[in-house]
Amino acid sequence: MGRHSFKTVSIDEFLELTLRPDLLNLIKKEHHKLMKVKLPGTIANFSRPENSSKNRSTLFPCWDESRVILKSPSKGIPYDNDITSTYIHANFVDGFKDKNKFICSQSPMENTCEDFWRMILQENCHIIVSLTKVDNAVYCYEYWANEKYREKVFGKYVIKTLEIIEEEVFTRSRLLLTDTNNDISQEIHHFWYTNFPLHYGWPIMSPELLNLIFHVDQKREELMNTTGSGPIVIHCSKIVSWTGIFCTIYNALSQVREEKTVSLPQTVLNIRKKRHSSIMNWVEYEICYRVLCEAILNLKTFMYCNLEIFSAFQDKVAAINFYFGKSHNKHSFNNK
């Protein structure tokens, strides 16, 4: 299979692109081209009958090659006797330049909460981003306590909520995860954003999403400069939808900041190679365009842009917002 790559453009070129009257058709064609790229990989562990109870859906597989493999807490190696003990529906996903920057996971179910916390401790994860409502059924099981000083217990893992901070658009909690068998504790920073639409109606609140990404990135930088941290864990009710959008915007913004360039299709392709079924729908891809577009308008990266292009773009922001909104009013999807 040949190597697939997409064109990288400057910020100026990206801004010019978003001003085109045929932008929606361009987005659809670009997404169609993405979907035609054959991805390498197998889904053998996802398909095992023994693991079916650990999957929320049969429609969205988990790649073998990038999956998180649960290990024995005592030996540090995968279990030999019980193949289901190594499995969790979660994959490592690279950042723009950082390998395994994220773990993209399905939202915990009642029977997978213990595995979820085992993964958090095993991979030294200190940040969790939840992009879903909690209903203990369809969307997400309550794997942490949304009340100060309360505890949740899953097997040998005790999760105590130490602090809850209500930000403008999300809830930030500080948790203490303890492995009671080995007397090991780890502090967790939990970001809970519930304003994602359950279906693909518009609008998605771009400033809110960007605010969330900023705070998550800020916390990660703080941890990396002090105690260190493993991957950022992200999950959503749709298994892959909003998780894929979050990672796409995060990585694209990293490229914008570091290199003053962007390649949205290449960013999506790289994520799809690690997390099966990510950005499957062109509407998801359009959302990525919209949010990135607004991010470039609001970040300090404008100092690197052509001022004439920037001014022209500013003049048309209202029209573009109306355009995107109109397209989403016409196309609403309930298929994930």
From Swiss-Prot:
Protein name: Tyrosine phosphatase-like protein H1
Signal peptide region: none
Lineage: Viruses, Viruses incertae sedis, Polydnaviriformidae, Bracoviriform, Microplitis demolitor bracovirus
Ranges for domain Tyrosine-protein phosphatase: 27-295
Family: Belongs to the protein-tyrosine phosphatase family.
A GO molecular function held by the record: protein tyrosine phosphatase activity
